[in-house]
From Swiss-Prot:
Keywords, alphabetical: Cell membrane, Disulfide bond, G-protein coupled receptor, Membrane, Olfaction, Receptor, Sensory transduction, Transducer, Transmembrane, Transmembrane helix
Gene expressing this chain: OR5BS1
Residue spans crossing the bilayer: 29-49, 66-86, 98-118, 141-163, 196-216, 237-257, 270-290
Keyword Cell membrane: yes
Locations listed in the record: Cell membrane
Gene3D superfamilies listed in its UniProt record: Rhodopsin 7-helix transmembrane proteins (1.20.1070.10)
Family membership: Belongs to the G-protein coupled receptor 1 family.
Record's function text: Odorant receptor.
Intrachain disulfide bonds: C97-C179
Organism phylogeny: Eukaryota, Metazoa, Chordata, Craniata, Vertebrata
Topological region Cytoplasmic: 50-65, 119-140, 217-236, 291-311
Family annotation (InterPro entries): GPCR_Rhodpsn (IPR000276), GPCR_Rhodpsn_7TM (IPR017452), Olfact_rcpt (IPR000725), Olfactory_GPCR (IPR050516)
Organism, as annotated: Homo sapiens
Name recorded for this polypeptide: Olfactory receptor 5BS1
SUPFAM superfamilies given in the database record: Family A G protein-coupled receptor-like (SSF81321)
Length: 311
């Protein structure tokens, strides 16, 4: 059959997580609570960092960007999931699906870059403390964040444009609760070689590159900490970096497991998608707020200021 005679798909069908109405109602409540907590945690982190002068440091500048990105990423996936659970509708338009794919790739690539930037920031702070203020100045911070967002935007745009060149003519059922690149690529009727090469290039260059930068930064930090004779000094270094290291571990572990497993619509794949898309953005602000004494103190200061305001 020639491509010109094929029927073009205009909508996709998302299989979702369950067809049972009772389970759907339970999932709706669960994901709504998680989504609201995700927005609350991340936007509260943005507000605290933006309004507290004690947190005007490069580390918290980068953390504010990460918190905003997590709130944005969660808003790409969860609202459509809630809409489908509530309305029992499972369709998503071609344009809406590809927009979601583009934004998901953009967010993931940007977060990988931001996490590497944050590791580099900690490396400079721990290994070159006397030059830290000179090296990581305001202009450098803005440039690193701008480069992270630009790389993410370019990665999302390139992968989505290559996917849009594919022809979708037959099955339109996506074995997932959201439009993601691997399951959508299975539905193409044309040769997906260009998209596959693009995905592999993204994973090897961006994924591996940022991971190498992360591991290199933390290796230097650990070696610096081990050379310190003071147990208090070592403890302070590990305490400062532990939150970021935990966030990095969760992000890369869930991301690698999600995208290295072939798309099949299995229960494991669905669980990994939920963990990567829904749970991870919720965990990040919790990890930083629970493990950072500075954030806790800043939050208490903000609440104290609010309580003193006249009614």
């Amino acid at each position: 059959m020639e491509v010109s005679n094929m029927t073009t798909v205009t909508v996709f069908i998302l299989l979702g997580l369950s067809n049972n109405p009772q389970v759907q109602a339970l999932l709706f409540v669960l994901f709504l609570v998680i989504y609201l907590l995700t927005l609350l945690g991340n936007l509260l982190m943005v507000l605290v960092i933006s309004t507290d002068s004690h947190l005007c440091t490069p580390m918290y500048f980068f953390l504010r960007q990460l918190s905003f990105l997590d709130a944005f990423y969660s808003s790409i996936i969860v609202p459509k999931l809630l809409e489908n659970l509530l309305s029992k509708g499972e369709t998503i338009s071609f344009l809406e699906c590809f927009t979601q794919i583009s934004l998901v790739i953009f967010s993931g690539a940007t977060e990988a870059c931001l996490l590497s930037v944050m590791a580099y920031d900690r490396f400079q702070a721990m290994c070159h403390p006397l030059l830290y203020v000179v090296i990581i100045n305001r202009r450098v911070c803005a440039g690193l964040v701008g480069a992270s967002w630009a790389i993410g935007m370019g990665t999302g745009l390139i992968n989505t444009l290559l996917l849009a060149q594919q022809h979708f003519c037959g099955p339109n059922v996506i074995h997932s609760f959201a439009c993601e690149l691997p399951p959508v690529l299975l539905l193409t009727c044309s040769d997906p070689c260009a998209s596959i090469v693009s995905i592999l290039t993204t994973m090897s260059v961006l994924g591996l590159g940022t991971l190498v930068l992360l591991l290199g930064s933390y290796s230097c930090i650990i070696m610096t900490a081990l050379r310190i004779n003071s147990a208090t000094g070592r403890s302070k270094i590990f305490s400062t970096c532990s939150s970021h290291f935990l966030v990095v571990t969760i992000f890369y572990t869930s991301g690698v497991l999600r995208y290295m497993i072939p798309a099949s619509g299995s229960a494991l794949e669905q669980v990994l998608s939920v963990q990567y898309s829904v749970i991870t953005p919720l965990l990040n602000p919790l990890i930083y707020s629970l493990k950072s004494q500075e954030v806790k103190v800043a939050l208490r200061r903000m609440l104290a200021r609010k309580s003193r305001l006249p009614l």
